[in-house]
Curated annotation (Swiss-Prot):
Its cofactor is Zn(2+). GO terms for cellular component: cytoplasm. It is an enzyme of class 3 (hydrolase). NCBIfam families: ectoine_eutE (TIGR02994). PANTHER family: BLL3975 PROTEIN. This is N-alpha-acetyl-L-2,4-diaminobutyric acid deacetylase. Disruption phenotype: Cells lacking this gene are unable to grow on ectoine as carbon and nitrogen sources and accumulate N-alpha-acetyl-L-2,4-diaminobutyrate (N-alpha-Ac-DABA). The keyword Transmembrane helix does not apply. InterPro entries: AstE_AspA_cat, DoeB, N-alpha-Ac-DABA-like, N-alpha-Ac-DABA_deacetylase. GO terms for biological process: ectoine catabolic process. The gene is doeB. GO terms for molecular function: hydrolase activity, acting on carbon-nitrogen (but not peptide) bonds, in linear amides; hydrolase activity, acting on ester bonds; metal ion binding.
Length: 342
């Protein structure tokens, strides 16, 4: 169990950049390790800091999961093109939060099996993944005003492109996050319900009173020209909206749709193992009681499939990407349509 913040030692991670210096810096967050391959080694997490004068600080993160490529790619590109003269304040760019997972192309770290987005607030005396989480919680988040964490579905999910905020106790914090999610300019904005939010990066940020916007921008363990274009436009909009970069918001061609996930019944999870057939395409409307998926027994033929039905009206916001499914896997996510924002 993690110690209370007052009992914890300083993070073992050190930065090769000066977060207070004006200009553009590219460097690393260095986490010491010792293993069979490197007795005196380090996990090297790339970081870029772009700063000019006084102003807000935005923390932009990708690679929280290593098989979600839109955020990784878009932030790598941003780190090469964003100039100090473009910025009023400070932009901290970490394209690959969980660098070991990213280099392995896996959701979790090959070093300790850690899922970074289930490891917060972290522990400076814990595993590699817990130490990374701790550094973000106690070093980077406190120096930030707004945080954008870029996700997609990875290898096992495909998700409509959206920016998300959460229901919060602080109404003003919730309002500002929702405005940022809408300003991101993805085809969808959503008020997202998390199945277990306790150890998420989202929660660690929100508990510090910071503005947090998350995204889901595709999936299948790849990226597309369309998903990258949405991601890059959204990052630019985020920086404009929160006053770090001057400019106008880039508005999508089609009206943005605002969705809500009110509770856990939005998630349709399999009670069987077998072959998955989705009967509804991603983004299509569904009605309560409609068959949205079938699971076939793969151990014999001539057996009728098990049907899964929608528990609410809405749109298919996410779906399992592989055709094989195990008991407990999320088959689909259905979100309710609140309004068209066009």
């Amino acid at each position: 169990m993690s110690k209370q913040p007052g009992q914890q030692r300083p993070s073992p991670i050190s930065a090769t950049v000066d977060f207070e210096a004006d200009g553009v810096q590219h460097g690393f967050l260095k986490l010491p390790i010792s293993n069979d391959e490197s007795a005196w080694g380090a996990v090297m997490i790339p970081v870029t800091v772009v700063k000019r004068g006084e102003g807000p600080t935005a923390l932009l993160t990708g690679g929280n999961h290593g098989d979600e490529y839109e955020g990784i790619t878009a932030l790598q590109k941003l780190s090469s093109r964003l100039r100090a003269e473009d910025v009023q304040g400070r932009v901290i760019i970490v394209p690959m939060m969980n660098t070991p997972a990213c280099t392995a192309g896996r959701r979790t770290s090959p070093m300790d099996g850690g899922n970074l987005n289930r490891s917060f607030p972290g522990d400076p005396d814990g595993s590699v993944t817990e130490k990374i989480a701790d550094y973000f919680t106690r070093v980077l988040v406190p120096m930030s005003d707004v945080v954008l964490d870029l996700h997609s579905g990875g290898r096992t999910l495909d998700i409509i492109p959206f920016a998300a905020s959460h229901v919060l106790d602080d109404a003003e914090q919730q309002r500002r996050a929702l405005e940022g999610a809408k300003a991101f300019g993805a085809p969808y904005a959503i008020m997202m319900f998390e199945l277990d939010a306790e150890a998420l990066f989202d929660t660690a940020v929100e508990r510090q009173g910071k503005i947090f916007v998350a995204t889901e921008l595709g999936g299948g363990g790849t990226s597309t020209p369309e998903s990258l274009a949405i991601t890059e436009r959204g990052i630019d909009n985020f920086l404009v909206h929160y006053g770090l970069v001057e400019g106008e918001l880039q508005v999508p061609d089609e009206p943005q749709i605002y969705l809500d996930m009110p509770d856990a019944s939005c998630y349709v999870q399999s009670e069987h193992t077998g072959l998955l057939e989705l009967t509804v395409a991603l983004g299509d409307p569904v009605t309560q009681g409609q068959v949205i998926a079938r699971v076939y027994d793969m151990t014999r033929s001539g057996v009728a499939p098990v049907e899964y039905r929608a528990e609410r009206d809405g749109v298919l916001a996410a779906r399992r990407f592989p055709a094989s499914v195990n008991m407990g896997d999320t088959i689909a996510v259905i979100a309710e349509v609140v309004e068209s924002l066009g």
